[in-house]
Amino acid sequence: MARKYEIMYIIRPNIEEDEKKAVVERFDGILTENGAEIIESKEWGKRRLAYEINDYRDGFYHIVKLNADKADSINEFDRLAKISDDIIRHMVIKEEA
């Protein structure tokens, strides 16, 4: 049975527009390549952070809603988001059935 997830991540603010699109496409691709079905992938825009993260005061928020049968896609996203210099913070939420 497919579980519903919501992922929110923040992209560093000093990124070029085309680089930002490439980051979003890359991470959407990571999810779909590992078996997830993306329902919605939307940009929330540039927002001020509640506190400073890696010397940044703001960032570009992005939200992805998806269905996944196995946690493989989520685990791979989580692993790669942690080592990406472009993503300064991310959070995965499993929605209740």
From Swiss-Prot:
Gene3D superfamilies: 3.30.70.60. Keywords: Ribonucleoprotein, Ribosomal protein, RNA-binding, rRNA-binding. GO terms for molecular function: small ribosomal subunit rRNA binding; structural constituent of ribosome. One of its GO terms (biological process) is translation. CDD domains: bS6. The keyword RNA-binding applies. Transmembrane segments: none annotated. One of its GO terms (cellular component) is ribosome. Pfam families: Ribosomal_S6. HAMAP family: Ribosomal_bS6. Binds together with bS18 to 16S ribosomal RNA. Belongs to the bacterial ribosomal protein bS6 family. NCBIfam families: S6. This is Small ribosomal subunit protein bS6. It comes from Listeria monocytogenes serovar 1/2a (strain ATCC BAA-679 / EGD-e). The lineage of its organism: Bacteria, Bacillati, Bacillota, Bacilli, Bacillales. The gene is rpsF.
